[in-house]
Amino acid sequence: MFSIFSCGATAPKNVVLGQARQSFLYLEKKVVLEQCGDHRCLKQELNSMASGFVIKATPDGSYGITAAHVCDTSLPQTSTPIKHVSTYTVTSLMGDEYKAVVLASDIKNDICLIYIKGLINIPVIKISNTEPKPGDTVYNIGAPRGIYQPNMVPMFEGVYNGKASLYAFYSLPANPGSSGSMILNEKGELVGVLHSVYVKFPQVVLSARYDVIHEFIRKNIIKYETYKSVMSVLELKDVFAAHKL
């Protein structure tokens, strides 16, 4: 059994949230686009933000989880090729900045694994050993609309509604910027990763199903641990790109 999976007991809400918020990550993505044609080049910079959290820490850095659409770098096909470079900056709860790389991404289920070199000695979010049941109380810690400051991140309480098809449904408030944020049970264990919200009713959100999240993290942590002793983080980025789900 991996140490990233939990068998903890329920603690008071303020204790659970106080510990979990230490694992929060604020993500900023910058994409530089360049398209050349007719003897001229056009360049544009796109910026976006999202949420994430630490799932495992090592002596050299930490693994983080966010939504796959945050990690996606695909572009529509055009008659003139578009060059693009994406960079990710991660800020911890206390305001320390790091660079991150994408290791694995499951677009279908909208979940992504990143690696943050140098982010050490940080609490991690454990994964629940059991999936939630409809009616269970859940907590969400994220940065809707980019609402975040050092040592301040919004926290919400909601309810698990059930699952259908690829999705798990939760009653929680969300907005752009909430993508990739943790959904926890009352023990502070991971049960969901928020990736979508109903635009006309932003109090109902979607996550990948618990079993999908559980397997994605388990499988990709194993892959990373297998390769990391002989390859650099940048080389690993290429390895995982060849093993996308």
Which functions belong to the PLM regions below?
Residues 7-9:
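N-terminal Sec signal peptide cleavage junction
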Residues 11-17, 85, 122, 190-245:
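C-terminal cap/linker of serine protease catalytic domains
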Residues 11-14, 35-67, 98, 180, ...:
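A conserved glycine-rich beta-strand in the N-terminal activation segment of trypsin-fold
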Residues 12-15, 122-178, 194-205:
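Flexible, gly/ser-rich surface segments that form the specificity/activation loops bordering the active-site cleft
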Residues 18-40, 138-140:
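A short, Trp-centered hydrophobic/proline-enriched beta-strand micro-motif
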Residues 30-32, 57-59, 67-71, 93-96, ...:
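Solvent-exposed coil/turn segments that connect beta secondary-structure elements
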Residues 47-49, 55-107:
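Catalytic-histidine neighborhood of serine endopeptidases
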Residues 53, 173-194:
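Catalytic nucleophile loop of clan PA
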